[in-house]
């Protein structure tokens, strides 16, 4: 008997994303200290998919119109993690086991649209990607990540 593929957020994840999107939500120190603002940037979330809009104001540039690659990788890890989180069952959580970020062109200023998608979800692993699009619609970067999926209690 095959298991039906779920297409909605689990109850746990509905609650998680509600807190994440609230202005007074308690963000983990790593996210807060990096200046990632999901309450402002997360525009859409559904099973296996997130859309972020990051207002690139130049504050993370190493040169004019060149964002520091480490910042892109950190933001990418957050976004692919949120993409994977959207596909978790109640009681599950995740950790990154591999992250690859490729920059195709310098990241311009303005709104950067980032689309995260679930590529594959197994019982204990998942694979996710995120594409960074510049305001002109050109693909500027792509991140891909493998995620270990465990019961949340295993992380305690």
Question: What does each model-identified segment do?
Answer:
Residues 1-156:
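Terminal targeting signals and extreme-terminal segments of soluble enzymes
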